[in-house]
Amino acid sequence: MTDILNTAAYGGEGWSPRTQSLREEIGRVWGKCGVDTEWSPLKAVLLHRPGPELEGLTDPRAFQMLAPLDAGRARKQHDALAQAYRDAGVTVHYVKPSKTPPPNLIFVADLMFMTPEGAIIARPASTVRAGEERWVARRLADLGVPILHSVRGKGTFEGADALWIDPQTALVATGLRTNAEGAAQVASLLREMGVEVIQVGLPYGVMHLMGTLRFADRDLAIAWPRRVPYAAVEALRARRYTVLFIPDEEEAIYGMALNFVTLGPRRILMAAGNPITQAFYEEAGITCQVVEMDEIHKAAGGIGCATGILEREINNQ
Protein backbone atom coordinates (compact mmCIF):
# COMPACT_ATOMS: atom_id res chain seq x y z
CA MET A 1 0.00 0.00 0.00
CA THR A 2 2.83 2.41 0.85
CA ASP A 3 4.37 1.86 -2.55
CA ILE A 4 1.07 2.66 -4.26
CA LEU A 5 0.61 5.88 -2.25
CA ASN A 6 4.04 7.05 -3.36
CA THR A 7 3.11 6.80 -7.06
CA ALA A 8 2.26 9.84 -9.18
CA ALA A 9 -1.41 8.82 -9.40
CA TYR A 10 -1.78 9.32 -5.64
CA GLY A 11 0.32 12.49 -5.38
CA GLY A 12 3.68 10.85 -4.92
CA GLU A 13 6.83 11.15 -7.01
CA GLY A 14 6.01 12.36 -10.51
CA TRP A 15 2.75 14.12 -9.60
CA SER A 16 2.43 17.30 -11.67
CA PRO A 17 0.15 19.88 -10.03
CA ARG A 18 -1.86 22.24 -12.19
CA THR A 19 -0.90 25.68 -10.90
CA GLN A 20 -1.74 28.02 -13.79
CA SER A 21 -5.05 29.83 -13.95
CA LEU A 22 -7.51 29.18 -16.76
CA ARG A 23 -6.62 32.54 -18.27
CA GLU A 24 -2.94 31.56 -18.33
CA GLU A 25 -3.79 28.28 -20.06
CA ILE A 26 -5.60 29.91 -22.98
CA GLY A 27 -3.61 29.51 -26.16
CA ARG A 28 -1.79 26.49 -24.75
CA VAL A 29 -4.17 24.01 -23.12
CA TRP A 30 -7.18 25.80 -24.60
CA GLY A 31 -7.72 27.44 -27.97
CA LYS A 32 -6.82 31.07 -28.55
CA CYS A 33 -9.67 33.32 -27.49
CA GLY A 34 -10.52 36.13 -25.11
CA VAL A 35 -11.96 39.64 -25.02
CA ASP A 36 -11.75 42.39 -22.41
CA THR A 37 -12.41 45.51 -24.51
CA GLU A 38 -14.54 46.50 -27.49
CA TRP A 39 -11.75 48.38 -29.27
CA SER A 40 -8.43 46.52 -29.10
CA PRO A 41 -7.15 44.80 -32.27
CA LEU A 42 -9.55 42.15 -33.52
CA LYS A 43 -7.97 38.70 -33.92
CA ALA A 44 -10.73 36.15 -34.61
CA VAL A 45 -14.48 36.04 -35.27
CA LEU A 46 -17.21 33.41 -35.53
CA LEU A 47 -19.69 33.74 -38.41
CA HIS A 48 -22.53 31.70 -39.86
CA ARG A 49 -22.77 31.76 -43.64
CA PRO A 50 -26.49 31.83 -44.48
CA GLY A 51 -27.66 28.67 -46.21
CA PRO A 52 -30.93 26.99 -47.22
CA GLU A 53 -32.62 28.18 -44.04
CA LEU A 54 -33.17 31.55 -45.75
CA GLU A 55 -34.81 30.08 -48.85
CA GLY A 56 -38.53 30.55 -49.29
CA LEU A 57 -39.32 32.59 -46.18
CA THR A 58 -42.67 33.95 -47.28
CA ASP A 59 -43.62 35.52 -43.95
CA PRO A 60 -40.57 37.32 -42.53
CA ARG A 61 -42.51 38.47 -39.47
CA ALA A 62 -42.84 34.85 -38.38
CA PHE A 63 -39.06 34.83 -38.04
CA GLN A 64 -38.77 38.36 -36.60
CA MET A 65 -37.35 39.76 -39.82
CA LEU A 66 -38.29 43.00 -41.55
CA ALA A 67 -38.77 41.94 -45.18
CA PRO A 68 -38.28 38.93 -47.48
CA LEU A 69 -34.62 38.25 -48.28
CA ASP A 70 -32.92 37.34 -51.52
CA ALA A 71 -30.96 34.41 -50.06
CA GLY A 72 -28.35 34.40 -52.82
CA ARG A 73 -27.66 38.10 -52.44
CA ALA A 74 -27.48 37.75 -48.66
CA ARG A 75 -24.85 35.02 -49.07
CA LYS A 76 -22.78 37.19 -51.41
CA GLN A 77 -22.86 40.06 -48.94
CA HIS A 78 -21.95 37.73 -46.09
CA ASP A 79 -19.03 36.34 -48.11
CA ALA A 80 -17.83 39.91 -48.70
CA LEU A 81 -18.08 40.58 -44.96
CA ALA A 82 -15.94 37.52 -44.21
CA GLN A 83 -13.39 38.59 -46.82
CA ALA A 84 -13.22 42.08 -45.33
CA TYR A 85 -12.26 40.50 -42.02
CA ARG A 86 -9.61 38.34 -43.66
CA ASP A 87 -8.22 41.37 -45.50
CA ALA A 88 -7.89 43.06 -42.10
CA GLY A 89 -5.86 40.14 -40.77
CA VAL A 90 -8.72 38.62 -38.77
CA THR A 91 -9.16 34.84 -38.59
CA VAL A 92 -12.67 33.80 -39.64
CA HIS A 93 -14.31 30.68 -38.21
CA TYR A 94 -17.75 29.38 -39.18
CA VAL A 95 -20.43 27.77 -37.02
CA LYS A 96 -20.92 24.90 -39.52
CA PRO A 97 -24.20 23.40 -38.25
CA SER A 98 -24.64 19.73 -39.14
CA LYS A 99 -28.22 20.24 -40.30
CA THR A 100 -30.33 23.15 -41.51
CA PRO A 101 -30.50 25.64 -38.61
CA PRO A 102 -33.12 28.29 -37.78
CA PRO A 103 -32.99 31.34 -40.09
CA ASN A 104 -31.59 33.76 -37.50
CA LEU A 105 -28.40 31.81 -36.78
CA ILE A 106 -26.65 34.37 -39.00
CA PHE A 107 -26.70 36.74 -36.00
CA VAL A 108 -23.99 34.99 -34.01
CA ALA A 109 -23.25 37.92 -31.68
CA ASP A 110 -26.53 37.30 -29.87
CA LEU A 111 -25.57 33.73 -28.99
CA MET A 112 -22.39 34.27 -26.97
CA PHE A 113 -20.44 36.80 -24.95
CA MET A 114 -16.69 36.48 -24.75
CA THR A 115 -14.61 37.18 -21.64
CA PRO A 116 -10.85 36.94 -21.02
CA GLU A 117 -11.37 33.38 -19.75
CA GLY A 118 -13.83 32.01 -22.30
CA ALA A 119 -17.42 32.26 -23.45
CA ILE A 120 -20.79 32.73 -21.83
CA ILE A 121 -23.46 30.92 -23.86
CA ALA A 122 -26.62 32.93 -24.37
CA ARG A 123 -30.23 31.87 -24.03
CA PRO A 124 -32.22 33.80 -26.67
CA ALA A 125 -35.47 35.39 -25.55
CA SER A 126 -37.70 34.26 -28.43
CA THR A 127 -39.00 30.80 -29.24
CA VAL A 128 -38.04 31.53 -32.85
CA ARG A 129 -34.36 31.46 -31.85
CA ALA A 130 -34.53 28.84 -29.10
CA GLY A 131 -31.78 26.26 -29.56
CA GLU A 132 -29.52 28.31 -31.82
CA GLU A 133 -27.10 28.53 -28.92
CA ARG A 134 -26.49 24.77 -29.19
CA TRP A 135 -24.75 25.19 -32.55
CA VAL A 136 -22.52 27.96 -31.25
CA ALA A 137 -21.66 26.03 -28.08
CA ARG A 138 -20.68 22.98 -30.14
CA ARG A 139 -18.46 25.04 -32.44
CA LEU A 140 -16.80 26.87 -29.57
CA ALA A 141 -15.98 23.52 -27.99
CA ASP A 142 -14.50 22.34 -31.30
CA LEU A 143 -12.30 25.46 -31.33
CA GLY A 144 -11.11 24.82 -27.79
CA VAL A 145 -12.88 27.84 -26.30
CA PRO A 146 -13.71 27.35 -22.60
CA ILE A 147 -17.45 27.56 -21.96
CA LEU A 148 -17.77 29.23 -18.58
CA HIS A 149 -21.53 29.34 -18.24
CA SER A 150 -24.74 28.64 -20.14
CA VAL A 151 -27.60 30.87 -19.07
CA ARG A 152 -30.09 28.62 -17.30
CA GLY A 153 -33.44 28.48 -15.54
CA LYS A 154 -35.86 31.07 -16.90
CA GLY A 155 -33.04 33.47 -17.59
CA THR A 156 -32.75 34.99 -21.04
CA PHE A 157 -29.62 36.71 -22.26
CA GLU A 158 -28.34 37.70 -25.69
CA GLY A 159 -24.69 38.56 -26.19
CA ALA A 160 -25.45 41.91 -27.79
CA ASP A 161 -26.74 43.09 -24.40
CA ALA A 162 -23.27 43.14 -22.83
CA LEU A 163 -20.31 45.36 -23.66
CA TRP A 164 -16.84 45.90 -22.20
CA ILE A 165 -16.09 49.48 -21.12
CA ASP A 166 -12.53 48.53 -20.19
CA PRO A 167 -10.83 45.39 -18.85
CA GLN A 168 -12.18 46.09 -15.36
CA THR A 169 -15.72 47.16 -16.25
CA ALA A 170 -18.65 45.78 -18.26
CA LEU A 171 -22.16 46.92 -19.07
CA VAL A 172 -25.03 44.41 -18.94
CA ALA A 173 -28.48 45.52 -20.10
CA THR A 174 -31.98 44.25 -19.44
CA GLY A 175 -34.84 44.75 -21.85
CA LEU A 176 -36.65 42.85 -24.59
CA ARG A 177 -33.96 40.19 -25.09
CA THR A 178 -32.28 39.92 -21.66
CA ASN A 179 -34.31 39.56 -18.49
CA ALA A 180 -33.28 40.22 -14.90
CA GLU A 181 -32.49 36.56 -14.20
CA GLY A 182 -30.25 36.22 -17.24
CA ALA A 183 -28.47 39.50 -16.55
CA ALA A 184 -27.88 38.47 -12.94
CA GLN A 185 -26.22 35.21 -14.04
CA VAL A 186 -23.90 37.03 -16.42
CA ALA A 187 -23.11 39.74 -13.87
CA SER A 188 -22.36 37.15 -11.19
CA LEU A 189 -19.84 35.34 -13.37
CA LEU A 190 -18.12 38.57 -14.40
CA ARG A 191 -17.90 39.71 -10.78
CA GLU A 192 -16.21 36.41 -9.89
CA MET A 193 -13.51 37.51 -12.36
CA GLY A 194 -13.10 40.81 -10.52
CA VAL A 195 -15.02 42.80 -13.13
CA GLU A 196 -17.24 45.69 -12.07
CA VAL A 197 -20.65 45.25 -13.68
CA ILE A 198 -22.90 48.21 -14.40
CA GLN A 199 -26.45 47.05 -15.06
CA VAL A 200 -28.64 49.29 -17.21
CA GLY A 201 -32.16 49.12 -18.59
CA LEU A 202 -33.13 49.56 -22.23
CA PRO A 203 -36.20 51.55 -23.30
CA TYR A 204 -39.13 50.00 -25.14
CA GLY A 205 -38.43 49.61 -28.85
CA VAL A 206 -34.71 48.89 -28.46
CA MET A 207 -33.54 45.41 -29.40
CA HIS A 208 -30.06 45.31 -27.83
CA LEU A 209 -27.53 47.48 -26.02
CA MET A 210 -25.19 46.99 -29.00
CA GLY A 211 -27.63 48.95 -31.15
CA THR A 212 -27.33 52.01 -28.92
CA LEU A 213 -23.61 52.16 -28.14
CA ARG A 214 -20.37 51.25 -29.91
CA PHE A 215 -16.71 51.78 -29.03
CA ALA A 216 -14.16 53.12 -31.50
CA ASP A 217 -11.16 53.45 -29.16
CA ARG A 218 -10.13 53.33 -25.51
CA ASP A 219 -11.44 56.89 -25.09
CA LEU A 220 -14.08 57.25 -27.83
CA ALA A 221 -17.62 55.87 -28.00
CA ILE A 222 -20.54 56.51 -30.35
CA ALA A 223 -24.06 56.51 -28.94
CA TRP A 224 -27.65 56.87 -30.09
CA PRO A 225 -29.38 59.59 -28.05
CA ARG A 226 -32.82 58.78 -26.63
CA ARG A 227 -31.98 55.08 -26.93
CA VAL A 228 -28.69 54.65 -25.07
CA PRO A 229 -29.14 54.27 -21.30
CA TYR A 230 -28.26 57.43 -19.37
CA ALA A 231 -26.28 55.39 -16.84
CA ALA A 232 -24.14 53.93 -19.62
CA VAL A 233 -23.14 57.37 -20.90
CA GLU A 234 -22.40 58.55 -17.37
CA ALA A 235 -20.24 55.48 -16.75
CA LEU A 236 -18.24 56.15 -19.90
CA ARG A 237 -17.73 59.82 -19.12
CA ALA A 238 -16.61 58.93 -15.60
CA ARG A 239 -13.91 56.81 -17.22
CA ARG A 240 -12.74 59.65 -19.47
CA TYR A 241 -14.49 58.59 -22.65
CA THR A 242 -15.59 61.14 -25.19
CA VAL A 243 -19.11 60.13 -26.17
CA LEU A 244 -20.24 61.29 -29.60
CA PHE A 245 -23.83 61.04 -30.78
CA ILE A 246 -24.90 59.80 -34.20
CA PRO A 247 -25.52 62.62 -36.68
CA ASP A 248 -28.34 61.05 -38.70
CA GLU A 249 -31.09 58.88 -37.26
CA GLU A 250 -32.37 57.78 -40.67
CA GLU A 251 -29.01 56.19 -41.47
CA ALA A 252 -28.92 54.57 -38.04
CA ILE A 253 -32.39 53.05 -38.50
CA TYR A 254 -32.38 52.06 -42.16
CA GLY A 255 -28.65 51.79 -42.87
CA MET A 256 -27.58 50.40 -39.48
CA ALA A 257 -24.79 52.97 -39.46
CA LEU A 258 -24.06 52.42 -35.76
CA ASN A 259 -23.98 48.63 -36.07
CA PHE A 260 -20.27 48.47 -36.86
CA VAL A 261 -17.42 46.27 -35.65
CA THR A 262 -14.20 47.81 -34.40
CA LEU A 263 -11.13 46.30 -36.08
CA GLY A 264 -8.70 48.15 -33.84
CA PRO A 265 -8.30 51.59 -32.29
CA ARG A 266 -10.19 54.06 -34.53
CA ARG A 267 -10.62 51.48 -37.31
CA ILE A 268 -14.10 50.15 -38.00
CA LEU A 269 -15.96 47.96 -40.48
CA MET A 270 -19.35 49.50 -41.24
CA ALA A 271 -22.24 49.13 -43.66
CA ALA A 272 -22.01 50.98 -46.97
CA GLY A 273 -24.61 53.55 -47.94
CA ASN A 274 -24.32 55.83 -44.90
CA PRO A 275 -22.46 58.89 -46.22
CA ILE A 276 -23.46 61.31 -43.46
CA THR A 277 -22.46 58.98 -40.65
CA GLN A 278 -19.30 57.81 -42.38
CA ALA A 279 -18.15 61.40 -42.85
CA PHE A 280 -18.94 62.05 -39.17
CA TYR A 281 -16.82 59.08 -38.11
CA GLU A 282 -13.95 60.11 -40.37
CA GLU A 283 -14.03 63.65 -39.00
CA ALA A 284 -13.58 62.08 -35.55
CA GLY A 285 -10.41 60.38 -36.78
CA ILE A 286 -11.96 56.97 -37.41
CA THR A 287 -10.86 54.99 -40.47
CA CYS A 288 -13.90 53.35 -42.06
CA GLN A 289 -13.95 50.23 -44.20
CA VAL A 290 -17.33 49.55 -45.77
CA VAL A 291 -19.20 46.50 -47.06
CA GLU A 292 -22.66 46.15 -48.58
CA MET A 293 -25.12 44.78 -46.03
CA ASP A 294 -28.53 46.02 -47.16
CA GLU A 295 -29.89 42.53 -47.95
CA ILE A 296 -28.85 41.17 -44.56
CA HIS A 297 -30.37 44.24 -42.91
CA LYS A 298 -33.78 42.91 -44.01
CA ALA A 299 -33.32 40.20 -41.37
CA ALA A 300 -33.19 42.96 -38.69
CA GLY A 301 -29.46 42.89 -38.00
CA GLY A 302 -26.17 44.33 -39.20
CA ILE A 303 -22.44 43.74 -39.13
CA GLY A 304 -22.18 43.80 -35.35
CA CYS A 305 -25.08 41.37 -34.97
CA ALA A 306 -23.58 38.96 -37.52
CA THR A 307 -20.16 38.85 -35.85
CA GLY A 308 -19.33 36.71 -32.87
CA ILE A 309 -16.15 38.18 -31.40
CA LEU A 310 -13.83 35.34 -30.39
CA GLU A 311 -10.57 37.13 -29.75
CA ARG A 312 -9.16 40.60 -29.35
CA GLU A 313 -5.74 41.58 -28.17
CA ILE A 314 -5.99 41.33 -24.39
CA ASN A 315 -5.14 44.44 -22.41
CA ASN A 316 -3.31 44.32 -19.09
CA GLN A 317 -4.44 47.64 -17.68
Q: What residue ranges belong to the model's regions?
A:
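The feature marks the mature, well-folded catalytic cores of soluble enzymes
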Residues: M1-Q317
